[in-house]
A protein has these predicted regions:
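A generic short-segment signal for beta-strand/edge and adjacent turn/coil regions
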Residues: 36-43, 56-61
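Short acidic/polar alpha-helix capping motifs at helix-coil junctions
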Residues: 2-3, 20, 42-44, 62, ...
């Protein structure tokens, strides 16, 4: 999983490690269109990225109340992640993540999403066609 520090300008969990991309849907925008817009803004030269919807869940705390839609993207070439907007970002193994879970190192949302992401990635890797 590629993770990096959340910007200090974020409403939630400033500076904590999280999945690096998020956006709000525009009025009338579909989930797919929003995910594609986010990817094309983040990776303007990579037109072959296909987001795959995995889960939606309700997230609420003292600061926000939102519905989260989580997508994953398979990348053959991770060099596109070497971008200044992902400063400090890196690929994490499950073992590295699990070592830091529950220590307030990751964002609250990521802590909730992790087990689901781990299962989805494991299944996708198991049945990946080479």
């Amino acid at each position: 999983l590629f993770l990096c520090n959340r910007p200090q300008s974020c409403i939630l969990d400033k500076g904590k490690v999280d999945i690096p991309m998020e956006c709000y849907l525009r009025y009338g925008e579909t989930l797919t269109a929003g995910a594609n817009r986010l990817l094309s803004n983040a990776f303007p030269k990579a037109s072959d990225l296909k987001p795959t919807f995995t889960i939606s869940y309700h997230f609420e705390n003292e600061q926000t109340n939102r519905l989260v839609y989580l997508f994953i993207v398979d990348m053959e070439d991770d060099s596109i992640l070497c971008d200044p907007r992902f400063k400090g970002g890196k690929l994490w193994t499950f073992q590295q993540i699990e070592h830091n879970l529950g220590t307030h190192f990751f964002s609250e949302c990521f802590e909730l999403e992790y087990e689901h992401l781990k299962q989805v990635i494991g299944i996708r890797e198991k049945y990946k066609v080479s």
